[in-house]
Amino acid sequence: HCADLHLDSPMETHMTEEQASTRNTEIIHSFLRLTEYAAKNDVRAVILAGDMFDGERVKVRTIDEILDAVRRTPNVDYLYLAGNHDDTTYAFADHDIPTNLKLFSKEWATYEYDGVVISGIEICEANAHSLYLNIPHKNGVINIVTLHGQVGSSSDVDEINLSLLKNKGINYLALGHIHTYSEQPLDSEGIYCYSGCLEGRGFDECGPKGFVLLTVESGHLEHEFVPFSCRQLHRIPVDISSLTKNSEISQKMKAAAQGIPSEDMVEFLLSGGVDPTANLAVSYLQNLVKSDFFFVKVK
């Protein structure tokens, strides 16, 4: 279960063109690595819970890479549910869709595997209320439902009415839209889970990113978050009260970031009262530490 790749989306505005290009390529390659992981570990199906793309920004070569990776792993099904940022009509125009790429639509669709059924629907204005009236369910198997949106208490295009999904026999509700992994009880039978994104893109997406591995054995479902990103993003608060020199501040920044791998991305958040005579220079501080990590931002 993964979601929210946002392929070819704009990167952090303060990145260099080269850094932004590198990150876009890495995000695409994270999905390619995911397909290899799935094939190697005998994963039967990958749930893509929305926002794989980012509107019409997606490049033809990106679509080609994604579809080629799907074709290279024919024993894995990819169950793709479009999200609010997706435009599948545009993305897949003039492309042959591999048989193992299964697309959900604005009507409920269900895919059956050994002891598991996976159902999903793309929420729109026409079905935002009615979709809760006929949620698919099959007795004697694990029932997984996938949706894209923000959980809440209303039924809307952008909001999933959690109360109307309770006590419907759902064992696992696979969600997309929130870019951080989280899980909560749905009812006595199941949980709802946001897988988060595969790779963080901005400093509002810090921490481990990856996917959720679901294992079903003897009618029992287990789930595990698998960190998978090639880089992490970090926000590091640094109290610079009483410091008067840029060199002192940079040393405190380095100490605060100790232990963070050099390939990661770091945003330093400076706080505290500074003497007006200190001649604090944010751009200079950024230059002092930028070689320590893939990307550095100082605020």
Residue spans of the language-model regions?
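Domain-start "cap" segments at the beginnings of catalytic or binding domains
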Residues: H1-Q19, K209, T215-V238
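Glycine-rich phosphate-binding loop signature in dinucleotide/nucleotide-binding domains
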Residues: A38-D42, K138-G140, G259-P261
